[in-house]
Curated annotation (Swiss-Prot):
The keyword NAD does not apply. Residues 18-459 form the UvrD-like helicase ATP-binding domain. It comes from Buchnera aphidicola subsp. Schizaphis graminum (strain Sg). The gene is recB. This is RecBCD enzyme subunit RecB. It comes from the Bacteria. One of its GO terms (biological process) is double-strand break repair via homologous recombination.
Amino acid sequence: MVYSDTKTSKKIKKYKINIMKKKLNIFQIPLKGIHLIEASAGTGKTSTIAFLYLRLLLGLEKNKENIRKLSVKEILVVTFTNAAKEELYIRIKKSIKELHLSCIKKKSKDPIFQSFLTKIKNFDEAIHILEDAKININNAAIYTIHGFCQDVLENNTLISNREIIENESFLYLQATQDFWRYFFYNLPKKIIKIIYEEYRSPEDLLREIKPILKVNSSINFKKKFDKKETLITFHEKIINKINIFKQKWLNYNLIILKIINQLKVNKKIYSNFNILKWKKKITEWAESETKNYKMPICLKYFSETSIEKNIKNYNFKKHIFFEEIDKILKKNFSLKNIILFYAIKNIPKFVKREKEKKLLLGFNDLLKILLKNIKKEESLREIIIKQYPVALIDEFQDTNIQQYQIFNTLYKNKKTALFLVGDPKQSIYSFRGADIFSYLHAKFKIKNYYYLDTNWRSSKNICKAINYLFSKNKNPFYFKNIPFEPILSSSKNLNMKFKIKEKNQTAISFFFQKKEEVNIEEYRDWIAKQCANEISYWLTCSKKGEAIISDGSQERILTEKDIVILVRNRTEAQIIKESLKKVNILSKYSSPYESVFKTFDALELLSILKSILDPTDINLLKKSILTHILNKIAFQKIKENSKTKISHFLIQKLYEYNDKWKTIGIFYTIKTMILEYQKYANNFEMYKNQQRNINFLHIAELLQEKSQNCYKENSLMRWFEKKILEKNNISENEYIKNFAESKIIRIITIHKSKGLEYPIVWIPFIVDFNVSKSYFYHEKKTLKIFFDNNKSSETLKKSDEERLAEDLRFLYVALTRSIYHCSIGISYLVKKRKKNKKSSDIHKSSLGYIIQNGKCMNYKELLYELKILNKKLYIEVKYQAMNCKSLTIKKDDLYILSQPQFLLKEIKLYSQITSFTKIKQENKHFNNIQYNNIESYFFKEKDKKKTIHNFPHGNKAGIFIHYILKTIKFNNTFNIDWFYTILKKYEFSEKWAKTLMFWINNILNFKINNLNITLSSLKKTQYIKELEFFLPIKNTLYCEDLNQIIQSIDLISSISQKIFFNPVIGILKGFIDLVFIFNKKYYILDYKCNYLGNNDNCYSSKNIKKEIIKNRYDIQYQLYTLALHQYLKKKVKQYHYKTHFGGVFYLFLRGINVKDSIFYILPDYLLIKKLTKLILQKK
């Protein structure tokens, strides 16, 4: 879509008068007013922001000595992603540190810092300011856009008791389902059948409109419907039009058949037989009842268009009905228009209603609320400006209209400063809501316009090649308003070279598939092979010392870590991975900002470490044995000694690791495991798993570091679990230390590569494209967003123009990642083969548009353009990669460890156990379970009288009893054979069967306090077993806050010692053994299999109370109550705690023969309210 209309051109010319485009001098730009800084790729955008930040800290204004110096809390820095926020924080922190050191030394090797020194008049003051900034950098106002909005709104109490949600997908699905029910359920069946042909489910409808619903600006419709227009009335209108046409057919068909018979038509198509057959079909349709909008396919042969194509004499006698047929065939009758109109109008309303009902806010709601309030409240604007007199907005090209309006409204005052830094050529995030048109709109309103013109990243020839490619076309980014300015190369990069066998390689190599009419599958296979072969050739040369990278001052040999392949998605990545695999090159598809805690290795290590902390927990043992490390060690033990019992061996091994952990620390414990694994692994396994070992050791380092501040091992595991669950907040030291640094080729999406740089880049699939199927576009004159629910071909064309424009920006981002060299694939690509097709489709792709100047070209014309490119010293066109043998990997053993080598047949396990709270676990000493107890689990028991008191105690026994109570039906009678089976399954002696049967029977018939009920009397509809819950900890939970609340209200807590744990935030997960309803009240019942002594008298109220205090079961019942309270609020109409919640029972199962073996408490409502506020309500 090119802005060529008169009104827009005049508007742009008007703005151009006001815009003074200047090259940026970091020390000359005023620190007041609104400034736009356009920074092309590699020109130092992040450094520019950091240097402006330093100027603001020191108050270095041109010719002004009295400008106020700002603190780190007063300089607002806003970007759009957490990764960018982290990068800015690191760069600003580093710059403060470097300038501080330079001020102390009064000299610097860096020319920028040296320039700062010449402008500082009072070094003592500057050192003090920078030292203060270093100390307070953690309080710097560096935000994502949504983080900034949330902070302002919460600090000014404009939102309260609202949960902020990042992902609103579930709300939109629910709203679409509500819309579906509201609009469709009461329709006649005949209309529902027609709708079903368009959309089979609410999910289908949501899939089509989701891109439109993501747009923050208001949407305009090409066709609007009157409020009185319903699906029924619209349907009836369509049916009426079809019926009118049917009647016309019955009236005129003989006349038009007579006309056709008189014409010299193509008799191969219009034979008498065909004409009569078509007439019969159409007449039968015309005489039948109209139930849908389908037309007979053969009707097209009677259209004016079809007849004109198939006659020799075009001046045939026309009848008006021929034209009528053409018109009705073009109508494409459908209910989609009206459905989409009402869906787009109403679904956001349903979402809004649901958010208000559930007290939820999405990220975009934060923008809307803040914009609304700052527009109407001058006092709020003043508060924000007073707090942040200067704002630096990073990645401004990724803005949308609301984000721009917020900052424009705040910083219109001349006394403030707003710096907008970005590059419209790199706006590639429309799928996330970024709107390049908002940027263009803002650009035209800003008078102070600066640019950066020196590329500090790439070699001179890379800069030349990119300048040439994007200067070939007058509008290289399709829109006239996004021009391309040739970039200069930094003087330090003038001698950068990539050499193979002492020959300098060109900056860009195009690999062209010399074949006409190539389809996408053929092209993908071919270019993937070329990519793999070329990289194989480079690496082979590298092994011989013949592949060299030189920065002008020193040379080094090319390694795998220097090479990156850029793709669009996982599908393209997989194609490349397979090709690389064929030539024995290892590769990895990953995110550049991926945390080591998000790897599968972190989950495996967590399973192992948990098992080390509790070797007797069979459930943990099951998970840990399925990990690669323990599985290999155990499997090798079987090979060495087939008589070894795996369960015994593993438990002993886990206890060994446990001792090491306590004596030499977690890092060396993990390292010992890896060394033991490597002792049994063959060379190829070790080669294959080097990345995993790097990850394990990396996590071990982080855990060792964290362990210095952790009170207990379980506390460390809680932190470890939290890091695995965290979505954001990734620290730089957590980024994966890729084995790719030495041995693996990285494959990264172009989206994720933005902002990064790589020595050598391959872009194999950039010539591919997907024509837009969206009916969503920006109107040329007003830049308003339109949705064409009429679905015209003109709209599709406009939408595809916008797609191509973004693809061109996508290409620019990909090309500008390279430092020394970039290889690109290209082909004479034909998406859909057509007869007599004289041109390919690549002009519709970004690369084709650039090379062919936006023109349609045939094969010879494309070859000619490539020959012109090939004449440039910095560009080369290749037709095939260098032939090279596959790289060899030494394999002492071809066996590949692809999965655990044996499944536990020996250890029979169940699937679930009751979870204790993690907070309690942090205070539990490991030595509560003694090694001697293991014998009662795995070895033959001595013959003695069987009672419930001497039934094996410990973790395994508790799990076993819980499993029985979870599995059985409360009101059934038992067969002793079942007990024999289950005892055998869990490796207990079958001699316990009779005792166990009586014990379980007594439990089920035990009277629960004053309720006068038993478990066996409960109906199935009265209870839920193993109710799982997840409670989000919205605020960092500190032990001091929890102790203060529970000890001030709860009697048991008040006489218990304070609990200690590290600050936590994340998700609290648990299982409630039993929830039951009686007399309209809901109760929690938790089974306790604790051993208090060898007779019934040991289970007195006094002893039970001591056991509850000792194990801090008070915190358990408080959190369980909180969880059930939240659950019932959603499930019970007009729910209130005091009316509907009955309390908590702890049933001590070994004391079931005495009345006192049950403990009851009803937690105070005030306690639950305070816990809700502390844990669940975002502060």
